[in-house]
């Protein structure tokens, strides 16, 4: 993906106007570019037909759109599709399209790999290979074949969004701006384990929904599952969240993978109730999907339902999230591109 040209995808309206100005074009040309990019999703500069041919040629000398189609797609029996997208750095990320009866959700990645190294997550086992620029985050949406069907976007793919906050905020700003996709921020959810200093900034600068990966309410146990607990503990996270209003349109949720014999007891349920008491939130219980060489197990459906019912009866609105795409390794915690990179490059060499 590396070349001498610069990319337009991921630039704000102000930056597009500056591009136009630097090339000797009227400032309003930047607004025209924004519409072609973020509302028409053009694949080439030549498709921007209300910009003069001479100005298009001038623009194309230094810039290109910066959109890249998917390199691979896997289809689940339940309708979920996992796409493999190339990035500008030559690496790959996985993106999951999840259609349902009355909605279609896209799970996007914000990094290649992840630094958080959660015990139960395949992405963490890949290691960290880099943060995505806003253009690569947006490309997962821009180049999605089903882009016109999308109703929701969740930042729950590869990577920790708060560890790439500048680019995540830039991407969500473009998604919600009038010149951009013009989406309501209520259609976007950003997930986090809780990263010190970054979570506070996100809460203040974004109106998108927030999902916190809790997975265990007891700090010492959570630290064993999630090393990030040692940086910003779950109790600190909850105290920070108490400073914000989630009683209206903005939603706060907690993600909780239920592990057999680890975080599924009444002690844990009671600890959750104490921890979030008075906080306007919901809990999503998630089934654990087995990862090779990881000595963790999921619980039965009956146990999940008992845990849900106990929390609900004690005032914590709780649901069990349906698992989607498990047969193509697209479910929660299973995304990884370490193997795929080699497969794609081998295929490219065979085609050469």
Residue ranges and their predicted role:
Residues 1-93, 242-250, 258-352:
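Auxiliary Fe-S-binding modules of radical SAM enzymes
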Residues 76, 109-110, 191, 213:
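Short linear Ser/Thr-Pro motifs
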Residues 81, 93, 104-108, 116, ...:
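Generic beta-strand structural signal
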Residues 89-98, 102-103:
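P-loop NTP-binding catalytic core
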Residues 135, 139-147:
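Ferredoxin-type iron-sulfur electron-transfer modules in oxidoreductases and energy-metabolism complexes
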Residues 145-152, 157-321:
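Conserved AdoMet/S-adenosylmethionine-binding subsite of the radical SAM
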